Amino acid sequence: MNKHGAQNTGKTIKRILSYMKKYKFRFIFVLICILLSAVANVAGSMFIGTLIDDYITPLLGSTNPVFTGLLKAICVMGIVYLVGILATLFYNRTMVSIAQGVLKKIRDDMFTHMQKLPIKHFDTHTHGDIMSYYTNDTDTLRQMMAQSIPQMFSSAVTIISVVVAMFISNVYLAIFVLVFATCMMFVTKKIAGASGRFFVKQQQSIGKVNGYIEEMINGQKVVKVFCHEEHSKEDFDKINEELCENATEANKYANILMPIMANLGNLQYVLIAIIGGALALNGVAGLTLGVIASFLQLSKSFTMPINQISQQLNSIVMALAGAERIFNLMDEEVEQDNGDVTLVNVKYDRNDNIVETEEKTYMWAWKEVQKDGSVKYTRLTGEVKFFDVDFGYNPEKIVLHDITLYADHGEKVAFVGATGAGKTTITNLINRFYDIADGTITYDGININRIKKKDLRRSLGIVLQDTNLFTGTIKENIRYGNLDATDEEVYAAARLANADEFINMLPDGYDTVISGDGGSLSQGQRQLLSIARAAVADPPVMILDEATSSIDTRTEAIVQRGMDALMTGRTVFVIAHRLSTVRNSDVIMVLELGRIIERGNHEQLISQKGKYYQLYTGAFELE
C-alpha cells in the first residue's frame, strides 16, 4: 500500500472510531468479556497437562483406581469453559448492538449530508451508485464491527495469553512457535496487501453495476420500445466483467489465505509433537506427557486466532474500502448559501406598516436586516428579473448567453425552443440549483444571491412532466407541498387542481396508499397530484416545466384547467412542447443555443414571421 493509501486508511479508521466513542462503556464491558474468554481458553489448555500428569497418569496400572479427583478436575475444567462460552456470548451480543447503533448514526449523517448536496452532484452520479452507499458499503461496515473487530480483539488477547502460557510451560518450544508464527504473519501481510487494492476497486465496480441496473429498471419501457435489449446487455456485460475481474483478483488472494494458514498451522502442530517428544526422550527441560499435550493444545489456541485474524483482514479491508467511499460522499462540498434575506409571515399594523407575526396570515415578505440594525420588509409579489445573465454547467462552456427578461407580478412568461436551447436551465437558475457565471437575477428587486436558498425555494412552486410521488397516502403526497397544511387546505388544493374527482373514486379516497412512485396512477392523475401539491404550497411564482407534453389531449384539457386555476394571480414560467399551451402567455421567449432570439406575445411573434412563426406553422418541429 502506498503512502497516500495508508494515510487515507488511517483517516478512515479514525473517523470510524469517532462514531464508536459514544459506546465506550459498552466497549469496556466487551473487553472484559474478551479477557475472560481468552483466559478461560488458555486456562483450559493448561489444565489438560495437569489433568494428564496429576489425575490420569497415576490411575494407569492402578489395581484400585479412585476417580473422585479426576471427576472434580473435569468439573472444574467444565466450569472454566462455561465461563468462556458465556463471556463470548455476551461480547458478541454487545458488539452487534454497538455496530447497529454506529451504522444508524452513519446512515443518518450520510442522509443529512446528502440532503445538503447541490443538484449538480445528483446530475453527475447515478442513483444506483448513490444507493450502494446505503446498502453494500454499510453492510461491509456492519460485518466488520459486529464480527471482525471483536474477533480481532479476541484473537489478539488470546495470542498474548497463549504466548505467556507457553513460556511458562516450556521456553524452547515457545521460542520455536514464535519464530514459526513470525513466518505466518509475513505470509498474511503479503497476501492481505495484495488483495486490499482490489477490494477498493471491487466496491467501486459494485456501485457502477448498481447504477446501471437502476437506470435500466427505470428505463425498461424505453429499452423495449427501441429494441435495445441486446445493446443494454452488451453494456451491462462490460460493467459486469469489470466487477468480475476486480472481485476475482480481490478474492483470489483472499481465498488462498485461509488454506495456507491452516496447513502452516497443521505443520506447526506436527513439528511441536516431534520436537517435544525428542526433548522429553532426552530428558530436556523436564517435559512430561501432560506438558506436551498442553503445549499442543496451546499451539492450536495460538494458530487458530492467527488464522482468524488473517480471515478477518479480508472483511476489514473490504469494510475500509466501503467506509472510504462513504466518507468521501460525506466530504463532498455542500450547497453554499450565504444569503441573509429571509421569508417571514407578516401583517399590516394599525398604521398600515408591515410587521412580522407568528400568525398564519398567508401574507409574506422578505426580511432584510440593514447595516444600522434596522429591518426592511419587502412584500412578496413574485417579480422576477434577469439582467445580462451568463451560465455554464462547466465554467469553460457557457450555455446561456446574455439572458435578460422581466416577469412582473401575475405575468405568464413562456419559453419555447428545441431541446438543449436552455429552457429548463433558466428555471434551474431561478431556483438557484445552479449559480450564474455573470449578470444578476432579482426577486422582488432583491438579488437572489442575498436570499437564503431555503426561503427562495419556499416561495416557488414547480410542476414537472416527470412527477415524483412518494410512498404514502394521496393526502400525504399533496401535503408534501406544505407540511403544515390542514386537511381542509389539502382538499381545497385538490379541488383547485381538478384532482378531487379522481381521488374520490379511489378505494380509500385521500387515504389511498400509493407506492412505487405512484405506478398504479395514470400520467395525468400523477400530474394532477403534482399540481395539487404546488397549490397547497400557495407560492407567488410557479414553474411549469413541460407539464403536459406526455399526456393525451383529453387528459391535457383536465390538467390545463387545473393549471389555469393554479396560475391565476401568480407569476408563471412555462416550458411546453405544445405551442397551444403557451399562446395565451403575456410574453413568449424563443430560445436557440442559449440565447433569446425572439420575444413578444403570440400575435407579435406570429406577425414577425420568425422562428416562432415557423414553429407554430409546422415549418420546424418543436422538440
Where are the regions that the model predicts?
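Juxtamembrane helix-loop junctions of ABC transporter transmembrane domains
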Residues: 2-9, 32-33, 40-56, 80-127, ...
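A short amphipathic helical element positioned immediately N-terminal to and/or at the very start
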Residues: 9-24, 130
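Transmembrane helix-loop-helix hairpins at lipid-water interfaces of multipass membrane proteins
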Residues: 27-90, 167-172, 283-289
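Hydrophobic alpha-helical transmembrane segments of ABC transporter permease domains
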Residues: 32, 87, 91, 99, ...
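An intracellular "coupling" helix at the cytosolic face of ABC transporter transmembrane type-1 domains
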Residues: 119-120, 136-145, 149, 153, ...
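Helix-loop-helix
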Residues: 165-179, 249, 253-324, 329-330, ...
